[in-house]
């Protein structure tokens, strides 16, 4: 990762070498610190995450692993915590053995002697500087290839810097000051427990929301699939009901319909003609009856007229016979008047008879008697 891991030991200072040849020895290698639980998990899954995300940077991969670590349950994290605690106990025992080892004790003695020599040399140099004496003398170089510019202010500052860092590293080393992260107070534990509870509540809430979202999604998906199936079924049904247009069949149906319409029209015309004939046939018998009645009445009228004519003929013969015997002009005139009166009476009777016949004939108002019959 980009930052230096917190579990790595502080860098050991480089051995300081003064112009007088005093060298501070390097300490022996201490035992390695145990890996923190997160770093154990990171080392375990690093290659897997790197293989699945080859294009990501190191800090992005570390961010992904951090999220995976936070998502682990307490039971899964406990495995790494147990390993860390076991190795930490071994590390403390190794550190005790390391501090009591002959190499470390020799390093402490050599270090103290070198520091004492350096302090003595620095005091002497300081005193010479206060007295104004030069702190070094120029002598001819025995080896021209061995170039030495002397003990400058830069070298002094470097020595002081390294010394200060050594002191700070010794003061703040684990052998003196315990790691703050390894010491958990009761108040801190209570705070952590409350944080864990709040995080668990928040996690359960998020899980419930995720379940609701998933249920809604599944419901929408189900409705969408159902609507799709119904649409496809309806489409198939409509495609099955598709009617192919056959122009020849349509033309045949049109011709058949026209033929049926023509036949119905002929039937209607025929029915109308038959009805007219029936109406005329019903009128003709009535006219015949009326004509027969008129003829009968005429015959009845003709009979009295014939009797009258015979009577008139008899009277005329009698008159002629009388005239032949004893006829007078006055008798002739009276006889002629009697004939005329008889004719007038006959004509009046015939007129009354014709009027009665016309009254009986005029019963059907729709069919008047023809003029020829009236004339007869």
Curated annotation (Swiss-Prot):
Compositionally biased tracts (Polar residues): 317-328, 347-359
> One MF term in GO for this entry?
N-acetyltransferase activity
UniProt protein name = SWI/SNF-related matrix-associated actin-dependent regulator of chromatin subfamily E member 1
Report the SUPFAM superfamilies cross-referenced here.
Answer: HMG-box
Which residues carry the post-translational modification Phosphoserine, per the record?
Answer: 230
Extract the ranges annotated as region (Disordered): 1-36, 118-140, 261-376
* Subunit text: Component of the multiprotein chromatin-remodeling complexes SWI/SNF: SWI/SNF-A (BAF), SWI/SNF-B (PBAF) and related complexes. The canonical complex contains a catalytic subunit (either SMARCA4/BRG1/BAF190A or SMARCA2/BRM/BAF190B), and at least SMARCE1, ACTL6A/BAF53, SMARCC1/BAF155, SMARCC2/BAF170, and SMARCB1/SNF5/BAF47. Other subunits specific to each of the complexes may also be present permitting several possible combinations developmentally and tissue specific.
Q: How is it modified after translation?
A: Ubiquitinated by TRIP12, leading to its degradation by the proteasome. Ubiquitination is prevented upon interaction between TRIP12 and SMARCC1.
Cell compartment(s), UniProt: Nucleus
Q: Which UniProt keywords are listed?
A: Chromatin regulator, Coiled coil, DNA-binding, Isopeptide bond, Methylation, Neurogenesis, Nucleus, Phosphoprotein, Ubl conjugation
Question: Glycyl lysine isopeptide (Lys-Gly) (interchain with G-Cter in SUMO2) crosslink - at what positions?
Answer: 3, 57, 96, 111, 131, 242
For biological process, the GO terms are: chromatin remodeling; negative regulation of DNA-templated transcription; neurogenesis; nucleosome disassembly; spermatid development
Copy the domain comment: The HMG domain is essential for CD4 silencing and CD8 activation; mutation of this domain blocks thymus development.
Report the function annotation for this chain.
Involved in transcriptional activation and repression of select genes by chromatin remodeling (alteration of DNA-nucleosome topology). Component of SWI/SNF chromatin remodeling complexes that carry out key enzymatic activities, changing chromatin structure by altering DNA-histone contacts within a nucleosome in an ATP-dependent manner. Belongs to the neural progenitors-specific chromatin remodeling complex (npBAF complex) and the neuron-specific chromatin remodeling complex (nBAF complex).
CDD domains on file: HMG-box_SMARCE1
Q: What gene does the UniProt entry assign to this protein?
A: Smarce1
Q: Which residues form a coiled coil?
A: 187-283
Instruction: List the Pfam families.
Output: HMG_box
